[in-house]
Amino acid sequence: GSEMCIRDSGKAGQNLSFNQKKALESSKLTGITFMNTKKRFYPNGLFAPHLVGFAEMNSKTKQIEGQLGAEKVFNSYLQGDFGKTEFNKDIWGTLIPDSTRITSPQKGGDISLTLDKNIQYYTENALDHLDKLYEPKSSFAYVVDAKTGEILAGAQRPAFNPKTREGFGASWVNALYQQQIEPGSTFKVFGLAAAIEEGVYERDKTYMSGHRTIGNHTIYDWNQTGWGQITYNEGLQHSSNVLMMRLQDEVGTDKMKMYYDQFGFGKPTGGLYNGEIKGQVPWEKEIQKKTTAFGQTITVTPAQMLKGMTSIVNDGEMLKPYYVKKIEDEHSVLFKAKPETEKSPISKETSEKTRRELTDVVNGNAAGENPYKLEEYKLAGKTGTAQVLDEENGGYVEGNYQYLTSFIGYAPVSYTHL
């Protein structure tokens, strides 16, 4: 007699292109059977892959299943249902009349994201340019609509191509909400806002910059010498650590912690994310409290920084950043996002005053040749440089890639939108 052997070629025989199929057919190899399957296409290539994610066929269930990003979070909406036919038979295998029950297949839903295609492509290209210019270990950039909380763009490097999966092994973590960093001086924005809210920030008041002793530790301004006796406004433009510690004292250490909590640090943003981390706000030792004033010791996610910044940019109303606009199937709209406002620790007046100071940080005389000072377009914000946390061994990274340099800001100043 003869025997028939069936062999599954595994992934090597999956996801064939039309041209590959035609080539196999023309080769006239025997024993090859082709099966139609569903497949998700990603025609935009490297386009917010960590937010969009990707899906692939589950060989056991024969269903396309989301593996990352929106594809994974909203898999149940996207997947649909094969449908089925059920019936009863008697003991002789005869179909029992009127016992057939048919469940029609359900088409998967559609998800609309908040991403702006033009801004997203620009952001992707900007990170590519930055990579070539500075060769950083990693980078990220996000753009949020200040009036709604919609994430208009989100990119990071290293990245992966969702179509080919090239680069995926080294870059599956979503920097927006799964990567905690010590933010450095960009965090000073929130201490400044708290000091203005409490009425202790007087822009023309003077103090002695340079250094300050906390217990057995001496903390210096970033240039190690300071700038002598300067105003609070000048200290902010120079990004003085001594100024921020002074403002923390004037607000009150524990009250400042309350402001950090209300800005949303140390807890998840509550966005529709998968595996969001909350960061940490250590507050046991005096040195931890003081270094938090200028963005060291504390760890945050970019999502938290963006959320807190909306309260400053949006007249004291804090918005939750989100990237899913709506979900709908062929029958109805299943979900439609709307701006979610949370209680902000600052007033509209404080928001306006904080923006005035941040405008000076970029455009003021003491700021010097700030790279964010543009002739044709006026923006405001705060730069930051922080030591990179070594999450595996504790302490800070040594050698190459010791520092995280960043900027958080908004534009245009005349009508704040992004």
Each predicted region: which residue ranges?
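Small/polar-residue-rich segments within soluble enzyme cores
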Residues: 7-108
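Beta-lactam-recognizing serine transpeptidase/beta-lactamase-like catalytic domain environment
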Residues: 90-99, 145-184, 190-415
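Flexible glycine-/small-residue-rich
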Residues: 53-55, 115, 145, 381
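Conserved small/polar residues in nucleotide/adenosyl-binding loops
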Residues: 1-9, 416-417
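Conserved, well-ordered alpha-helix/loop/beta-strand core segments that scaffold catalytic motifs
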Residues: 96-139
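Amphipathic, well-packed alpha-helical segments that form the structural scaffold of globular domains
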Residues: 79-82, 93, 112, 124-128, ...
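Short loop/turn microsegments at loop-to-beta-strand junctions
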Residues: 138-141, 375
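Loop/turn elements at helix/coil->beta-strand transitions in domains of secreted/extracellular proteins
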Residues: 137, 415-418
